[in-house]
Structure formats: C-alpha cells, structure tokens
C-alpha cells in the first residue's frame, strides 16, 4: 500500500488524508542513480568561465633572457616559460561546459526515489492553499502547528503568487513551482509541502508524472507527425505551383 499524506488547511488543521500515487511516492529508490542525477545537476550549476593564460597568451618579449652558456643557470629561451615569474600556466583551466546529458527517464526515476524516501518517513504533506491574500504570519502559523522542519520545500503552481509571497522571506523555506521540482531540492529538505493544485498538476490527470518543461499547461502538445497522405498532398501542391509558373 502506497504512503499517504495529511492534508492541512491554512490554519494548520488536518482536513483529511490523501493516498499518494504509488509509482511516484512508493518506488524502489536507486541510490546510484540518484547520486548520478544530483551530480549532473550540480555540475550544470557551474558557469565554466574559468581561464588562465598559456605561454602563448601572456605578455612578454620573445627575447632570450640570457645567453645559452657560461652563466651556470639552466638554459632558457623565453621569459614566458612556465618556470619564469609572470610566465604562462601549464595545463591550466579553460572555458568549458560541465553539463552532463541525463535522459529524462533517469531524472524522473531519481525524483521518484527521493520523494519515496520522504513519503515513507511521513514527510510529504499537502495544504489546500495559502489563502486568498499573501500572509507570512499565516504561513508561519501553519508550519509551527504542523511541526514542519525549518528545512522545508514548498511546491506550488507557477501562477500561485500568494504562496510565493507568503513564504519567500521565511528562513530555511524554499519554494519551487511544479516544473522546477528536482531530486537535489528534495534531498536537501527534510519535509516537502505540496499545495493541492500543485500535487494535481504533478501527478497528472492519469496519475502519471507530467514530466515536461511546462507542467502548468497540460494542453501543450507536440506537433503532429506528417502522414503519407499529407506528404502526397504537399507534393501535388508544389507540382501545381510549378505548372502555374511555367504556364504548362
């Protein structure tokens, strides 16, 4: 039986329980997969703009600093050599991208594993809404009465400005919209609080994870692939336009 979550109102009163979707909140966590996805996410945070100058890029003369023999020093042909003061850096960092390609199925499986860990520990909760007007005091009251941890992840819809303005200044509370929910934020938070609307969007109408860039627009769909009939019609149209131009 999949875990359940307590549903609260903005006053902190329990108004019911909700059976969580099994394959999202009661899966088999793969620790290696979660680690791989989190490392890829942290690597994507890096800008990769680091840069040092090589001996070909540093400023300096090409003149030989001293004669080849007779000084007792090791021979040297340039003041831009790595061992010289002000010389170039050998094998230094150069601008690069740290992005790891991570398939969507892996990202989805890792997120389900993280949510499963929190759900089995009773740390996934749902609130009806944050009210009609933003109120930091009401949000603090909700967190205190329900005993939510100071490390809290709030998941709301992108259009829910009331939730955003109610919790944005509370220390230790991070708010993300449904399209931003990820494994790293779930792991770094002790409790996860969904608004009811965000939970419905997250699981989708069929009880499946609506994993897309815009989960708040379920009507968005990909263009339909052309059929052989469409290709034939397009060929006929091009042929007709060609005949009109040539006067045939």
From Swiss-Prot:
Subunit description: Part of the 50S ribosomal subunit.
Source taxon at top rank: Bacteria
Source lineage: Bacteria, Bacillati, Actinomycetota, Actinomycetes, Micrococcales
SUPFAM superfamilies per the UniProt record, alphabetical: Ribosomal protein L4 (SSF52166)
BP terms from Gene Ontology: translation
Name the record gives this protein: Large ribosomal subunit protein uL4
Alphabetical list of Pfam families matching this protein: Ribosomal_L4 (PF00573)
Gene Ontology molecular function terms on file: rRNA binding; structural constituent of ribosome
GO cellular component entries: ribonucleoprotein complex; ribosome
KW Nucleotide-binding (keyword) present: no
Region feature (Disordered): 48-95, 210-248
Family: Belongs to the universal ribosomal protein uL4 family.
Chain's role: One of the primary rRNA binding proteins, this protein initially binds near the 5'-end of the 23S rRNA. It is important during the early stages of 50S assembly. It makes multiple contacts with different domains of the 23S rRNA in the assembled 50S subunit and ribosome.
Native source species: Tropheryma whipplei (strain TW08/27)
């Amino acid at each position: 039986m999949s875990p359940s979550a307590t549903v609260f109102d903005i006053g902190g009163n329990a108004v019911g329980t909700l059976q969580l979707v099994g394959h999202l909140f009661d899966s088999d966590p793969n620790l290696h997969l979660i680690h791989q996805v989190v490392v890829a996410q942290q690597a994507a945070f890096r800008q990769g703009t680091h840069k040092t100058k090589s001996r070909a890029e540093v400023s300096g003369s090409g003149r030989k600093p001293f004669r080849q023999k007779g000084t007792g020093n090791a021979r040297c042909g340039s003041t831009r050599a790595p061992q010289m003061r002000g010389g170039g850096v050998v094998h230094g960092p150069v601008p690069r991208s740290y992005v790891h390609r991570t398939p969507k199925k892996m990202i989805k499986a890792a997120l389900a594993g993280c949510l499963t860990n929190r759900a089995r520990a009773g740390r996934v909760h749902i609130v009806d809404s944050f009210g009609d007007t933003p109120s930091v005091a009401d949000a603090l009251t909700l967190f205190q009465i329900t005993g939510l941890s100071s490390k809290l992840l709030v998941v709301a819809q992108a259009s829910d400005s009331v939730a955003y303005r109610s919790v944005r200044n509370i220390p230790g509370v991070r708010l993300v919209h449904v399209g931003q929910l990820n494994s790293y934020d779930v792991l770094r938070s002790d409790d996860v609080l969904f608004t009811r609307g965000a939970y419905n969007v997250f699981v989708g109408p069929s009880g499946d994870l609506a994993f897309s860039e815009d989960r708040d627009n379920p009507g968005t769909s990909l263009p339909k692939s052309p059929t052989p009939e469409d290709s034939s019609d397009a060929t006929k149209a091009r042929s007709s336009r060609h005949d009109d131009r040539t006067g045939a």
